[in-house]
Amino acid sequence: MPLIGDKFPEMEVQTTHGPMELPDEFEGKWFILFSHPADFTPVCTTEFVAFQEVYPELRELDCELVGLSVDQVFSHIKWIEWIAENLDTEIEFPVIADTGRVADTLGLIHPARPTNTVRAVFVVDPEGIIRAILYYPQELGRNIPEIVRMIRAFRVIDAEGVAAPANWPDNQLIGDHVIVPPASDIETARKRKDEYECYDWWLCTQSRG
């Protein structure tokens, strides 16, 4: 099972948009792969609507989205049609129809429910490296804005070589500022308070950019 920091496994998948090769399909872009337990289920339906709502925002962040479950393509298609007809939402992102091979590779099959994928999220960067993995129980839907926040934060982290605080960009202590990496030697530590806004030499912040 791949972990954070690992290369996303190479795989050929069948989706509602046709065959794809991951992670090459999204080379140079961020992508989010999320698994859902099954089509035509209540919580998963609310999640698909919520993911579609933020899909344009994700694409503006140069991030793609792909769903996955152990269901056949025709099931995905009928469910997507149902969502469009009954919930007035056109699902625009691809959904992987998995026979179980992809789910096994990514560690998405729960032993107690071998026919259902767990509710998981993989965040993959433009180099194909897994940057975050989230798991949710079957009865709890995902917080979609948090997933978007992660993409925004990772882009800033990578571009500026900083860290993002809790609840960024609305942190209780430093607002939308970011955290400067701690000093790694005594001389740098001594200079820190003159260079940045600091609570102490090991907790210094700066404004964006």
UniProtKB/Swiss-Prot annotation:
* Compartmental location: Cytoplasm
- Has the keyword Transcription regulation been applied to this entry? no
| Annotated active site | C44
Listed GO MF terms: thioredoxin peroxidase activity
The Thioredoxin domain sits at: 2-156
The UniProt record lists the EC number as: 1.11.1.24
**Cysteine-cysteine disulfides:** C198-C204
Q: Which transformation does this protein catalyse, written as a reaction? A: a hydroperoxide + [thioredoxin]-dithiol = an alcohol + [thioredoxin]-disulfide + H2O
Q: Which residues bind substrate?
A: R119
User: PROSITE patterns under this entry?
Assistant: THIOREDOXIN_2 (PS51352)
What are the GO cellular component annotations?
cytosol
- Alphabetic keyword roster: Antioxidant, Cytoplasm, Disulfide bond, Oxidoreductase, Peroxidase, Redox-active center
Q: Name one GO biological process term.
A: cellular response to stress
Gene3D superfamilies assigned: Antioxidant, Horf6, Chain A, domain2 (3.30.1020.10), Glutaredoxin (3.40.30.10)
Q: Which family does it belong to?
A: Belongs to the peroxiredoxin family. Prx6 subfamily.
- PANTHER family, per database record: PEROXIREDOXIN 4, THIOREDOXIN PEROXIDASE
Q: How does it assemble?
A: Homodecamer. Pentamer of dimers that assemble into a ring structure.
> Its function?
Thiol-specific peroxidase that catalyzes the reduction of hydrogen peroxide and organic hydroperoxides to water and alcohols, respectively. Plays a role in cell protection against oxidative stress by detoxifying peroxides.
Spell out the note in the miscellaneous section: The active site is a conserved redox-active cysteine residue, the peroxidatic cysteine (C(P)), which makes the nucleophilic attack on the peroxide substrate. The peroxide oxidizes the C(P)-SH to cysteine sulfenic acid (C(P)-SOH), which then reacts with another cysteine residue, the resolving cysteine (C(R)), to form a disulfide bridge. The disulfide is subsequently reduced by an appropriate electron donor to complete the catalytic cycle.
Q: What is this protein called?
A: Peroxiredoxin
Provide the species name.
Answer: Methanothermobacter thermautotrophicus (strain ATCC 29096 / DSM 1053 / JCM 10044 / NBRC 100330 / Delta H) (Methanobacterium thermoautotrophicum)
